[in-house]
């Protein structure tokens, strides 16, 4: 399946298509969108976003704890969409 992922960036909103087996960060890059990242392995917080609507699978990440995920935080480098969703990007500072 392919889902529509709406990214709310500091400079505006854009909607991309993302396959259920594709990380959101990779799909954004394929669409020419520059999102922050560092490790690309789900082990740091550089690419943090907040899921505002929809559902995601981020079982590949190892950085966020259950409380942070319950608040909607996700690491876009290791997050797959499981529905159409909306994600606010550039949210690393909100984690701490």
From Swiss-Prot:
One of its GO terms (molecular function) is 2 iron, 2 sulfur cluster binding. InterPro entries: 2Fe-2S_ferredoxin-like_sf, 2Fe-2S_ferredoxin-type, 2Fe2S_fd_BS, Beta-grasp_dom_sf, Fd_pln. It is found in: Plastid, Chloroplast. The keyword Coiled coil does not apply. [2Fe-2S] cluster binds at residues 39, 44, 47, 77. Keywords: 2Fe-2S, Chloroplast, Electron transport, Iron, Iron-sulfur, Metal-binding, Plastid, Transport. One of its GO terms (biological process) is electron transport chain. Binds 1 [2Fe-2S] cluster. Residues 3-93 form the 2Fe-2S ferredoxin-type domain. One of its GO terms (cellular component) is chloroplast. Its cofactor is [2Fe-2S] cluster. NCBIfam families: fdx_plant. Belongs to the 2Fe2S plant-type ferredoxin family. Ferredoxins are iron-sulfur proteins that transfer electrons in a wide variety of metabolic reactions. This is Ferredoxin. It comes from Euglena viridis.
């Amino acid at each position: 399946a392919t889902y529509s992922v709406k990214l709310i960036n500091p400079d505006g909103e854009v909607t991309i298509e993302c396959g259920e087996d594709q990380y959101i960060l990779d799909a954004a890059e394929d669409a020419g969108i520059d999102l922050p990242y560092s490790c690309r392995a789900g082990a740091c917080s550089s690419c943090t976003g907040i899921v505002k609507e929809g559902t995601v699978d981020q079982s590949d990440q190892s950085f966020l704890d259950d409380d942070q995920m319950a608040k909607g935080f996700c690491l876009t480098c290791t997050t797959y969409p499981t529905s159409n969703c909306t994600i606010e990007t550039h949210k690393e500072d909100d984690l701490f």
